[in-house]
Amino acid sequence: MAKYTPNELADTLKEGLLSFPVTSFDANLQFDEENYRKHLAWQASFPVAGLFAAGGTGEGFSLTPAESERVVRTAVDEVGSRVPVLASAGGSTAQAIENAKAAEAAGADGILLLPPYLTEADQAGLVEHVSAVCRATSLGVIIYNRANAIYKDTTVATLADRHANLIGFKDGVGDLEHDARVYAKLGDRLFYLGGLPTAETFALPLLQLGMSTYSSAMYNFVPQFALDFYQDVRNQDRAAVNKKLNDFVIPYLDIRDRVKGYSVSIVKGGLDAIGRSAGPVRTPLQNLAPQDLADLKALIATVS
């Protein structure tokens, strides 16, 4: 059973840093539950506001439904008493409903609703898609604005009016006008989180558009740095943010951008670099090349 009402969950998540733990695999690319539990326990030992199990950084796209449910259950069991645990729901409307129900049964506290799978939809279709999921669960639901699910401000307002358990808007597009429209129309009815890759890059300007938090991938391997960066953002300390961008985040981006798909691979590479390996990534992703891993390890040493 969820430990938070939707409103309580929103109030908790919007005031702190969020992260998507990687999913641990063994050498045969099978879920390594023991190692995953160790990683979660370490992550939860820092003051993170919420963890999203089996999300994008957790290679949720490479997990079977049964694996995803097991990952979520493991996360709830290991750290659910200390930090909110959220799960993803995606695919077709029917699949997203199944995901949401399974997450609720597993004890998750909330749902991140991913875009429908490989199909285009108009705003009316998106309203029905989100509505079906919100009706299927009592958990707080966060919609993810990206790719083929771009929610107009009027659409978000319609959904917020219909469903009290719609609590959040995550943006993975970066259209500033769009974000401004949504925040201006909805205000405090929702909470807003940044979801662009390596969200630290955009965190300070997006704070002005109501995005008080974001999902940090690098929290997986440099949690204290990630928390310090987040605090600098919330303090609107531009000098401190820019220093951290120049010293670490931008060089990190340079390594990430060497190969398509490194956005996830580099996070597991970061764990390799600090001696807390979560195993390899599953295909179609590729593990970091040796030189890229060496460069990342040297970079991490500058902030550890």
UniProtKB/Swiss-Prot annotation:
This chain belongs to which protein, by name? Probable 5-dehydro-4-deoxyglucarate dehydratase
The record's Gene Ontology biological-process terms are:
D-glucarate catabolic process
Write down the InterPro entries for this protein, in alphabetical order: Aldolase_TIM, DapA-like, Dehydro-deoxyglucarate_dehyd
**Pathway named in the protein's UniProt entry:** Carbohydrate acid metabolism; D-glucarate degradation; 2,5-dioxopentanoate from D-glucarate: step 2/2
An example Gene Ontology molecular-function term: 5-dehydro-4-deoxyglucarate dehydratase activity
- Zinc-finger recorded as keyword: no
Q: Which organism is it from?
A: Pseudarthrobacter chlorophenolicus (strain ATCC 700700 / DSM 12829 / CIP 107037 / JCM 12360 / KCTC 9906 / NCIMB 13794 / A6) (Arthrobacter chlorophenolicus)
Any Pfam family: DHDPS
HAMAP family in the record: KDGDH
Q: What is its EC number?
A: 4.2.1.41
Q: Does the keyword Cytoplasm apply?
A: no
